[in-house]
Amino acid sequence: MVTVEEVRRAQRAKGPATIMAIGTATPSNCVDQSTYPDYYFRITNSEHMTELKEKFKRMCDKSMINKRYMHLTEEILKENPNICEYMAPSLDARQDIVVVEVPKLGKEAAQKAIKEWGQPKSKITHVVFCTTSGVDMPGADYQLTKLLGLRPSVKRLMMYQQGCFAGGTVIRLAKDLAENNKGARVLVVCSEITAVTFRGPSDTHLDSMVGQALFGDRAAAMIIGSDPLPEVERPLFELVSAAQTLLPDSEGAIDGHLREVGLTFHLLKDVPGLISKNIEKSLIEAFQPLGISDWNSIFWIAHPGGPAILDQVELKLSLKPEKLRATRQVLSDYGNMSSACVLFILDEMRKASSKEGLSTTGEGLDWGVLFGFGPGLTVETVVLHSVST
């Protein structure tokens, strides 16, 4: 008779989890950041708030964002005027949009990831779906399973209302699933639509306007699994370790509350300062076992919560400007996409590395770090190992 230990050994994968494919998707509606303040104040019937509009213009100018993509068009907003007010009851209208559109956008990204992976979708064993855009039962994970035609026995995990750190969370969870279930192939999807957070301006709550200047809509998907099949599956990055921590003295720094008026965000403390002050501790804990202490010797994927966070992290750690190049590029091209951001940066980095003829998917370097930052303040730290291009 076999022992429990023998059963456990047979259930576990031999090698580390790897990212095998990445896919992304975007709504068709593209918004130019330079003209967005005029549009935003017009569509929310707030053009009389001239001083506030000038403040918002300065926010957009300093955002380092060139363009964003949004599901909410002028037509949709005119049909739902309560969404355009600052604090009008509007949750039903918002839910009607995101419950349908979040899984649909996720499906687009997932199909691209599955195509790159090259295996039949019947080989997907697990689905991890993450969104901060709305809540429903059965969830977006169920809707995605139906939209893709996955097996009814696929094991699903739905993560709602996590916020901007959750791109790191889904990678950490998928790593554990892949390494502890031999042959597992985990479809990870992050899909975010700002229909839950869009609202008109308020001169008493400027932190709400920060979000209006930064957030954009997109979805990203990955296939994660261990022990890739030779000649069939090609890993892009290996997942070496993953950790989560709460930063000291940061309670209330970022809050989000789902109310009748939608999802409201509040920035209550110096978020860039809190992150930059504490980030090196997470780096030391993650890289000391590898004998790495030079933060310029690794590649970087950091959630671009905003330019101030990136600037202060860069300054605190004396990072060379090119270290956050991929992160800044994604911020410029898409804005802050909450949980989907770090997946987009991974995609940007591996594509740029190949295009530039660099030796690895990590800008020619072997080791790298992925950071997710969000409400809590919560920090996700993932150590990555690149592969040859």
Swiss-Prot record:
Gene3D superfamilies registered for this protein in UniProt: 3.40.47.10
GO BP, sorted A to Z: flavonoid biosynthetic process; polyketide biosynthetic process
InterPro entries according to UniProt: Chalcone/stilbene_synt_C, Chalcone/stilbene_synt_N, Chalcone/stilbene_synthase_AS, Polyketide_synthase_type-III, Thiolase-like
EC category: transferase
E.C. no: 2.3.1.74
A Pfam family recorded for this sequence: Chal_sti_synt_N
Catalytic activity, reaction form: (E)-4-coumaroyl-CoA + 3 malonyl-CoA + 3 H(+) = 2',4,4',6'-tetrahydroxychalcone + 3 CO2 + 4 CoA
GO molecular function (one): acyltransferase activity, transferring groups other than amino-acyl groups
Catalytic center residues: 164
SUPFAM superfamilies: Thiolase-like
Alphabetical UniProt keywords: Acyltransferase, Flavonoid biosynthesis, Transferase
Pathway: Secondary metabolite biosynthesis; flavonoid biosynthesis
Family: Belongs to the thiolase-like superfamily. Chalcone/stilbene synthases family.
Role, per record: The primary product of this enzyme is 4,2',4',6'-tetrahydroxychalcone (also termed naringenin-chalcone or chalcone) which can under specific conditions spontaneously isomerize into naringenin.
Identification of the protein by name: Chalcone synthase 2
The gene coding this protein: CHS2
